[in-house]
Amino acid sequence: MERFKKASSIIETLKQQGHEAYFVGGSVRDLIIDRPIGDIDIATSALPEEVMAIFPRHVPVGLEHGTVIVVENGEPYEVTTFRTESEYEDFRRPSSVQFVRSLEEDLKRRDFTMNAIAMTEEGKMVDLFAGQEAIQKREIVTVGNAADRFQEDALRMMRGIRFVSTLGFSLETKTKQAIETYGHLLEHIAIERITVEFEKLLTGTYCVKALKELVETKLFSHLPYLQMSEEKLLKATQYKWDSFEADIEAWAFFLYCIGEEHPAVFLRQWKFSNKKIKDIVAVLLTIRKRKEKDWDTVFLYKTGIHIAEMAERVYEAMIESYDHTAVNRVQTLFQALPIKNRQEMNVTGNDLLNWASKKPGPWVAEMIQKIEEAIVQGNVVNEKECIREWLQECNLL
């Protein structure tokens, strides 16, 4: 409760001004579950302009949705006016938002009962939709009619399965049936938003359970490049997914599991950044080489420790070896390298030009590369004079 105590002065101030105010959302859910608390959100009957008038230190981030960030005790908190939402457009966005003075009306519009629990500053729960019961049963249940909730916002179906992965809960029967029925609506949702949820699914503690739900609900068939992947997704559930330390590793392993032959095309379709695509593809290419040969100094140096560590963890998952001794060996081997990158070389192109008395040209870059490999392989010490002598001995000057 310590983190809530820091924010409780906001609720107390709002109440002193004649308004209602409560802690709401994921932070309340996580407190009940005893998970680490993320962002703390507050819902209030005060209108946005009233919130801004009461708290001088504020940022009006989403006034059309009733949200104001209030800075209290050096921490930012989202304070949002109770609201209802009218008809939804594109199965994602409400066409308009109406501010209301009723907590019940505000909680009624939320996705799942576990996320529709409010809490007073004293820690008393206001649970109008049996959210605590769902948490006790470890069930994901929609607020009200599941069909209505998913037709309002189709992304909620992906969120539901993402919560299976992060919390280990199960989809309640009617909620699961509604996902099977309305899964096609997911095709109306921007892929960027789906990618965010899918990444949380892949990196969740209970990823295997979530992948099974993805198959059982047929929701996978409405995702780009996964329409024909039922058997491969089921194969993916036979592996352990808890050894990865980065989302790049999880995506690389997922692409391996589904046998994706053109990973860059897949990732572009899912709207990944170029940097992330480059890293994921680099991990996969490294694994392909790793299958053919063990690590040596040149292979490791050219790969770099960042990609090498990730590739080794994914490779361990592929061969179902989870003791991390191979990762530790890669780290030890890398630390023993004479240089970790080209910037650590004690020779420059200007040095070569001075020594050789030749005109600049492609030969300089070629020579730097030869020296670099010789240093990495231990054939020459990374000192300027040693490098010069080595070049002379090899008749390269």
Curated annotation (Swiss-Prot):
EC number: 2.7.7.72
Enzyme class: transferase
Further comment found in the protein's record: A single active site specifically recognizes both ATP and CTP and is responsible for their addition.
Positions annotated to bind CTP: 26, 29, 110, 153, 156, 159, 162
Gene Ontology biological process terms in this record: RNA repair; tRNA 3'-terminal CCA addition
Gene3D superfamilies for the chain: 1.10.110.30, 1.10.246.80, 1.20.58.560, Beta Polymerase, domain 2 (3.30.460.10)
InterPro entries membership: Bact_CCA-adding_enz_type3_sf (IPR050264), CCA-adding_enz_C (IPR032810), CCA-adding_enz_firmicutes (IPR023068), NT_sf (IPR043519), PolA_pol_head_dom (IPR002646), PolyA_RNA-bd (IPR032828)
Job description of the protein: Catalyzes the addition and repair of the essential 3'-terminal CCA sequence in tRNAs without using a nucleic acid template. Adds these three nucleotides in the order of C, C, and A to the tRNA nucleotide-73, using CTP and ATP as substrates and producing inorganic pyrophosphate. tRNA 3'-terminal CCA addition is required both for tRNA processing and repair. Also involved in tRNA surveillance by mediating tandem CCA addition to generate a CCACCA at the 3' terminus of unstable tRNAs. While stable tRNAs receive only 3'-terminal CCA, unstable tRNAs are marked with CCACCA and rapidly degraded.
Reactions catalysed: a tRNA precursor + 2 CTP + ATP = a tRNA with a 3' CCA end + 3 diphosphate; a tRNA with a 3' CCA end + 2 CTP + ATP = a tRNA with a 3' CCACCA end + 3 diphosphate
Cofactors required: Mg(2+)
Protein name, entry field: CCA-adding enzyme
Binding-site residues, Mg(2+): 39, 41
Subunit comment: Homodimer.
Similarity comment text for this entry: Belongs to the tRNA nucleotidyltransferase/poly(A) polymerase family. Bacterial CCA-adding enzyme type 3 subfamily.
Record key words, sorted: ATP-binding, Magnesium, Metal-binding, Nucleotide-binding, Nucleotidyltransferase, RNA repair, RNA-binding, Transferase, tRNA processing
Provenance organism: Bacillus cereus (strain AH187)
GO molecular function list: ATP binding; CCA tRNA nucleotidyltransferase activity; magnesium ion binding; tRNA binding
Binding site for ATP: 26, 29, 110, 153, 156, 159, 162
CDD domains from the UniProt entry: NT_ClassII-CCAase (cd05398)
